[in-house]
């Protein structure tokens, strides 16, 4: 598949999830998203209203992070926070699974949590992304989660929050994609800071990239295409 600069930009969830982010920081994030035509801004739930107002009358989404970054909230709390975020303007949701219950092998809990989160998102026609936080998981746990997702069908499964000890890995993206196939998309996030890493994740099967380095990445890709005198880059997946 051949990608233009805009195609690449539309893969990016432009991210600022820092605890000390100000309204000025959020405005900058949204302004950059508009300038580069990113797909979404990824922000903490409490900033849903502010960012959705900044992005009004654009095709750029406001993505609220739920139970971020630990996932240690009840299902009821996650569902409440999701609906609250949506009512305040969020039109994409990324939530962190309850890793404790996964470690307990309480797969019924994980399945019920995912089902309720997907249902509340889809009630409002909002995409739901499930954050695995792979740095804490074994390969078998990643596989099991992906199998549950294949059954429940969230819109995306996601590698990481970016706040754990490590972020996205190419082998994890490949593993996740190999299980869900075309039923669910994969989002790579965490530690993707340059154009080589970005392209590697797309080649591995990621359909969305969460990163705070989106401007730097797009500018590097523009320069690469200019140097090669091309308007597209072909990616074989």
Curated annotation (Swiss-Prot):
Its main location: cytoplasm. Pathway: Carbohydrate degradation; 2-deoxy-D-ribose 1-phosphate degradation; D-glyceraldehyde 3-phosphate and acetaldehyde from 2-deoxy-alpha-D-ribose 1-phosphate: step 2/2. GO terms for biological process: 2-deoxyribose 1-phosphate catabolic process; carbohydrate catabolic process; deoxyribonucleotide catabolic process. One of its GO terms (cellular component) is cytoplasm. SMART domains: DeoC. Belongs to the DeoC/FbaB aldolase family. DeoC type 1 subfamily. This is Deoxyribose-phosphate aldolase. It comes from Lactobacillus johnsonii (strain CNCM I-12250 / La1 / NCC 533). The lineage of its organism: Bacteria, Bacillati, Bacillota, Bacilli, Lactobacillales.
